[in-house]
């Protein structure tokens, strides 16, 4: 704000009652001081109308200032609106301020603002840093430029303009010009260039300024076309920052490190300083169930966590937690909780600490639901709380998962290794896992773990099996089994002592292979029941095929939960009840809500997809045959 002048010097005004007050005349410039500018900045009279009999004369009383230093901008504009003399738009438009009308934009002869020969504008800060009159200390301002400025200010009513706004605009224009000059040639001046009022991103330097260049070579975008650009000096301190002192460089490095850590592993959680929980035998550390034509593989032994070769492998490792409980990682369609990438890895919760001290530690394999292949179950203990491929809800913390109770490295592992190796034998998947394996591998003894399971774990296991069976059928085609398969399925139950459930639970031969690989407790002598398929039409085969897939110990009825009195009876009862419920639900699928347009559309799409899926293997086989014949001809 410019200080107000209470005592004017020789201002004469003409006041009439009919017209508004006229604008005062500007005083003569006597010296290059800031007081005269401040005199010109504000009205020097009270601006009050006088009677008609008042004649010309000098005001003898001190004027009354209408605007104080504490008044707001709105008050200034109100006073200007009340007291300003109205002018036309043509008079106001060409009278706008320009850079040549302000003395602080003129090049000075000061020693601190000298330029090279022919320079048209200063690139360095002069001693006069702003339009504030209190900071004017230079004696190089002549009276002629000051009078010129005063005359130009008087021509467009300087007292009616907000000089503070004009000064800020001019200062911004000056800084923009200097920033352009600093961008073109950062080291043309012999003193550092100030960048007050500019953002850090706008003050950049030429990276080639440190290199030697021709002094006579013109620089593009220089302020003047005929300027002589001196030889470049070493750049300022901002251009020669070391990497350890550059904040932006450090921030970029940290960001790159964070991105590399987040993207490393492609979904696997790699712990560099935490050893993996594995045993001494490599086949026990991790089992890869794979697809139809793969054999069980194992990951790297303890000490390193390798990338999973397919998406149907699971491994165990120690999480970054304080407790000794390991996490079990198994295949699924969800993302990893600690690394949110779209990959089929699902965490199965933590094991209770009490189970880690057991001497018998069977390694449970979880069903692997690939995109279009069959689920391959394997021996599982009773309290299996798992989340197969479909997007079901995660198990609540009430159910512990003793599916894999590998002892810690400090516990003796002698009796656990033979048990683990024996339980892995029936996990081998042949070229056609849908067929039933030999009866020698069907009976595998596992310890009685029903003491660790509860009703919620049984119910959760049954629900997960139901969703898996309905969403992920066994075979890629929905064709009925052949006659040879029918005889084979009839011969297998007599060898494996299979009990037949009620006749309404009809299943396919693919479900038969899953049930033959289910493990039973040691005291149970007969495996799970199985029946031969009894489908009549092609469309009815597919619903019957996956009524019950992968029945295991711990499967339960959603309505009735039988307490685990023994290791065999609850599972058989629950499986039979679940079979009845699934059969009833499948039978009522087409009869309920027949008028619902959404269900009608979905059922039509399901029938079409089943038909396409049924004919797809024949298309693939014919295409393969044609391609093979063409290759032979070539």
Curated annotation (Swiss-Prot):
The keyword Phosphoprotein applies. Residues 503-515 have a biased composition (Basic and acidic residues). Residues 1-69, 81-142, 185-242, 368-455, 472-534 are annotated as: Disordered. Signal peptide: none annotated. Residues 15-24, 203-215, 436-448 have a biased composition (Polar residues). Residues 40-56, 128-140, 185-202, 368-377 have a biased composition (Low complexity). Keywords: Cytoplasm, Cytoskeleton, Phosphoprotein. One of its GO terms (cellular component) is centrosome. It is found in: Cytoplasm, Cytoskeleton, Microtubule organizing center, Centrosome. Its main location: cytoplasm. Residues 378-399 have a biased composition (Pro residues). The modification Phosphoserine is found at residue 588. This is Proline and serine-rich protein 3.
